[in-house]
Every structure is written in C-alpha cells, then in structure tokens.
Amino acid sequence: MSIYICAEIGINHNGDMSICKQLIDAACESGCDAVKFQKRDLDQVYTQEFLDSPRESPWGTTQREQKAGLEFGLSEYQEIDQYCKDNNIDWYASAWDLNSQKFLQQFDCKYNKVASAMLVHNKLLKTIAEEKKYTFISTGMSTLKDIEKAVKIFRKFKCPFELMNPHSAYPVSYTHLTLPTILLV
C-alpha cells in the first residue's frame, strides 16, 4: 500500500452534520485520502450504571444523553456516505462492538478499522476478519500478546491488514512516544 492519509474525525463532529461536513471538507482540502469515524452501540459498549451516571453536557445531564448526542444513526451515515462520494474521499469507521460492525457492513467502505481498545474483543475481530476487507489495526493500548492474537485471527481468515502503532492519549508528549515499538509490530 502506498502512503494513505486519513483524517480522524471520530466523534469530533459533536453529533452535528454541518460540523461533520466541514471536517470532511477540511480533509479534502488538505489532500487526505479518507476520513474515519467511530461507531458505538451505547448499550453494548457501556454499562447501564455508567450510562445513568451524571454528566452535564449540551445534550443532557447523564452519560447516556452525552454519548447519544455524539452518535450518528443510519440517516446521518447515509448522508456521510453520499457526501464523501460526491467529494471523492473514502470513509470508514472503527466499530466498538458487533452491532456497530454489522451496521457498517451496509455501506461500501473500502476499509475496516480496529480501535486499539477493541483488540481484545475476539468476536469483533473474527467478524471483521471474515469480511476479508483490508483492515487497519491500531495497537496503541495493547500488549504484544494481544497483538499476536489479533494477527492470528486475521491470518486465519486470510484478511489483509496493517498494524498501526498510534499513541492513545492526545496530545502525546515526546517522552511518551513509543516509536521503537514500530520495529516490533
């Protein structure tokens, strides 16, 4: 694979399609090849206790209201899909659970992405690998053993993949960079 530049949008759109489109436009203007989002089924990723806990936000007073305010559903992803096609930029998303991966399968994204926090979720890895779609696998929050297990799953299903060694805290200080790890993965 040649150099491929992807702009991480994640949930930085704040649940607002106009902000989302501005971020896609900025990625296009910057010469990016793709934009990436994050998709979660809140009831699969978080506990009821956590979702019910207090959190003041523009969307309400609980974690659930805040998290739900940041999530896009089918109509928004259909709009993202069309907007990216119209602007000749790829898009894909990291699914944080099985339901979200199944949701994303209805779109014709070139790539899958595994978030480093999900590298220990074997059912999710298997579901993604079975698609045999080129997959970017983040390793920033993982042990070498976790990485080896994931690689084994993707090789078993003959799914092409790329290991990425990001740092999972933003911004990262120079002293916390783990660049030598790139040689290991």
Spans of model-derived segments:
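Glycine-rich, proline-tolerant flexible connector loops at the mouths of alpha/beta enzymes
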Residues: 35-69
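Hydrophobic faces of well-ordered beta-strands that scaffold small-molecule active sites
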Residues: 5-7, 35-37, 91-93, 112-114, ...
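Active-site beta->alpha loop and helix N-cap motifs at the rims of alpha/beta catalytic domains
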Residues: 59-116
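Conserved, mostly hydrophobic/aromatic
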Residues: 8, 27, 104, 163
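Conserved anion-binding
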Residues: 120-172
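Conserved small/polar residues in nucleotide/adenosyl-binding loops
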Residues: 175-181
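Catalytic domains of carbohydrate-active enzymes, especially glycoside hydrolases
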Residues: 22-38
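Active-site mouth loops of central-metabolism enzymes
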Residues: 6-19, 67-69, 90-92
